[in-house]
Amino acid sequence: MKRNLMFKVLLMLMVGCFLSIDAFAQQMTVKGLVKDTTGEPIIGANVVVKGTTNGTITDFDGNFQLNANKGDIIVISFIGYQSQEVPAAPSLNILLKDDSQMLQDVVVIGYGTVKKNDATGSVTAIKAEEKNKGLTVSPQDMIAGKVAGVNVATSTGQPGGGSAIRIRGGSSLTASNDPLIVIDGVVMSSGSVEGLSNPLSSVNPTDIESFTVLKDASATAIYGSRASNGVIIITTKKGKTGSVKINYSGNVSVSTRKNKIDVMTGDEYRDFIINNPNATEAMITAVNLYPGVNTDWQDEVMRTAVSTEHNISAYGSVKDYLPYRVSFGYTNQNGILKTSNFERYTGSVSLTPKFFDDHLNMNLNAKGIYIKNQFADTGAVVGAVSFDPTKPVKNDNNKFGGYFTWTTDNDPNGTKASSAGVNPVSLLEMTDDQSKVKSFIGNAQFDYKVHFLPDLRLNLNVGMDYTKSDGDKYVDPSAPGSYGEDPLKSGSNYLYFYERRNTLLDFYAQYSKDFAKQHFDVMAGYSYQKYHYESNKETWYLSRNEENFGEKTSMNGDQQPAESQYVLLSFYGRLNYTAWDKYLLTFTLRDDASSRFAKNNRWGLFPSVALGWKMNEEAFLKKFKDLSELKLRLGWGITGQQDIQQGDYPYMSFWRYGQGGAMYPIYDESGNVKWVNVVSPSASSPDLKWEQTTTYNVGIDYGFFNNRINGSADFYIRDTKDLINAEVNVPAGTDFAEYVVANIGSLKNTGFEFAINAKPIVSSTWNWDLGFNVAWNKTEITKLDYNDNSDSPGKRFESTGGDGGKTIKIHSVGYAPGTYYVFEQVYDKNGNPMEGVYVDRNGDGEVTEKDLYQYHKPTADVIMGFNSKVSYKNWDFGFNGRASIGNYNYNGIAANAAIGTSAIFSNSALSNQPKAAFNTNFQGRQRQSDYYIQNASFLKIDNITLGYSFENFLQGAKYHGLSGRLYATVQNPITITPYDGLDPEVDGGMDRQVYPRPISVLFGVNINF
């Protein structure tokens, strides 16, 4: 037995020995040299055994060495070159060719594409893999901080809430400053509807393939009258030839409040009132109504919110000639403010068939979206700060739905105390505010390469953009905030609908030809676009009687039906010329007509010209082998603006009913009276015309080390004239109103942008990508109103929210739009602000409104974006951040705080105050003090993501397995700012009752089947 066992052991050892010898014989040391087509060694090229993590990189001489087995495949790759796969051998000489796809990478521009290397305008393209990760409910979330000069300000945490997008600071005062949005060739309607924040929200972010941002006029002028504020072009994902492939992505997120306003607790508030020497007996009685109650109202209106998202798509082709892609998505996002919710269903279909030997290419797209919104009253955010913390959420009195409500003399059976704060929880729970939105974007594009003249292409695009929003806001008749003493006029029901329809027809012909070393590309086209809007609003009183509780009784005011339409007609063309692949010329011209202007001003001509010089192609720079790209760009162009915001036909006068139902008596011969409605004409502006913006741009695109380091720098000057002003004073008696809409004004933008992207580490196991961009912008009004030398300081606007409608902002010549207009605060020797004491700036011996002055602005001087991603084998870690410098907010919550008895007690009701009020000890509110204009510069980390990628999971003999990625993200984790409010990022700078942005933790998965 022992001999048999020993024999078996010896046999196994011998077999193992032979196997080891065989394996050793199969293994080899692979040495090699990697060069480019010019014979130069390539430093840092990846060399890896295919299907393994066994790899290395080339040294400074292009050499490499690694161990491999006979039969292994060696993969050699480097940025900017085509990868090669070769069998393992002891000695290898590898020649990598330039990656023509990368060199000829195209970007989408207006009515066509251009090779990235040949672009002459200020154009930035972001591909799908470069977009921000994390919680991206709306497409604008993907590009925040990614593009130099583009500011995406998300100032609300409302589920589904949108962002204000500004490219190079905007170019208008009262007309729109939003960029033009183009989705798959459809120029979108501007503006928002209730429940759909902006045109970008019409697309599921997971369906987006790329963003292209056109910034200067040489790039945007092809869109003419709508391109003064830049253009964002979105291209969605298409089908691909081959078998069907299915992708699923989903995530679950948990969101919570990031911080809150520091206010007095119930016990602190009792002590404050009881120990206040100015407290009245009524105040002490009121604060002791509910002994021991400590209600944190901010906790009562906020919650931890759980949200989910699911997306599935399938793409492939039918018999190689009909590529397709279909997708479906579902999002359910709960807000941290109670009762708020955003639910969205999306679907898209894309077909890209080809016919006649690829001479006819079709691009058929359809995208649908259905949204259900549950809005929360954001007044509850401020109400939670100021409501008395010694009172319970509910009491035994069912008169107001059981919610504690201040009544006259605190009599449970009394009427609601006038001017008293409303229970913030009741604002949320006794209001049902919903909207349902349906949106559709579709187009059919036909691109025909003429058979007998293949250099000529004919392109026809027909499309539409349709949106309808139906809203129903129901406020319970017992709700404290709308409780009416008349039981038939209590509560409210606000009903509305809004429908817009945008139809489009574009046709252009394009001829491209190469002559020796010259390339010509000429395009000319025609566009017709019609916009139609229709809406209606009505508000009803409700019954509080038991027998018909909640039913409509009578209308509060009149119905407000509205319907309008306008048409844009355009002819456009473009010439691209390239000589010796070094010298570039682009010329565009667009002639636009808008029905929004009178016939004599209807047409506007918008030209542009741009020059490019690929300096790295010159002989004197060819010797610098590490210089991949150096291109100088010069651009000039004129763009327009016709998005007036004051109706579609301000040049016309309309007859309208008199205010307040005014009527006029008419008597017949018998003396009988007949009352008729008074009508009068509205003001008109027959000379109203386009805003025109002229832009000068100088830029450089650069790249080093085969574009491992690349970026751009731009300097621009943008002059806008004929600014459309909504309220231009006119002399009495010259029109039917005190103000008209007119072209009186101009402004100037000056700015600089810089962007850099780098790959510091590129290896078979480690990779590191870095990105940084910074932009400086200065905007100044250079002319305003009829007379720049008048005594008027400018156009004042933006109410403080109190003080009888006093304003806090102004448009003034020599200053940025919307500069704050305030009193200069005086401070005591200890640096504390003195209540009601301001600087007499004009020296007339008294402080009046003539002493108000321009002080800071809500827009930033400098904005920055940065990102980093490190990957090791299958793991990746990255973050994205932004910074804003020089922007100031009006802290309306602090400005509304005071500790005097008149501020905290009114008509039997007490109100809490932020503890910041004790920093000033102001007894009354000083809303126009510059003390409340606070530095809101910030540094934010928008998201931090850790991911793990996998492939060949569950692989079998007949199944290729699954590939995908698991990831975890923290959204909005870090904010560094000197600002005292909840969040420094406030669109427009007015921080009064903002829905706070939460901090979110997200877990997600992306799987390819």
Residue ranges and their predicted role:
Residues 247-291, 647-650, 761-858, 959:
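Conserved small-residue
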Residues 1-355, 360-369, 377, 414, ...:
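Short, small/polar-rich motifs associated with maturation and membrane association
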Residues 843, 877-940:
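C-terminal beta-barrel architecture of Gram-negative outer-membrane proteins
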Residues 857-890:
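Glycine-rich, aromatic-lined ligand/substrate-binding cores of catalytic
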Residues 140-144, 741-748, 788-820, 850, ...:
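C-terminal extracellular loops and terminal segments
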Residues 47, 76, 181, 826-827, ...:
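Short aromatic-centered micro-motifs
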Residues 131, 178, 281-284, 305-308, ...:
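Extracellular/periplasmic, surface-exposed regions of secreted and cell-surface proteins
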